[in-house]
């Protein structure tokens, strides 16, 4: 990296977020997102009227629920809107939806990225979380906040129910079911209800690392 900084500044300036100063513990940050861009992205991402939900980060802003995005292609209008649960279209088999639900794989990568950024910025970068709340925290604490929200998909609430079980008594209270979690493919962006394949032990199984990392 030092060679690129000294000999290829044209490349380094495009891809190294901060060449003028080093970050926490004298680190350099290799990232496509500069500090200004990161702040702007997080302002949207941490807005509870847009991406931030009780159970993680939505795959599309809730803003588009009442304001669908439309575009005209060769006189044909195509529209996409916020759909928090199962797909309302038969496209791609109709059994998957990236227009609103919470996907654990994406949320996990977001958490990992925030922790990497925190390794560079440390406590110096404070972001409002949630947006509009007046509460500011560093990126490490924001990552922890997202991890806790993800855990709320599976943790029992005061009534003994898990959001992912969607109020099904058998799954929440039956002695043969209540302690055995289903690893759903994705989750409703508003309620946390488990959707898609219920045996998605791959990326949804990442919740185990989330729980481990947060204690």
PLM region spans:
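Acidic, mature catalytic/reactive cores of soluble proteins
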Residues: 1-215
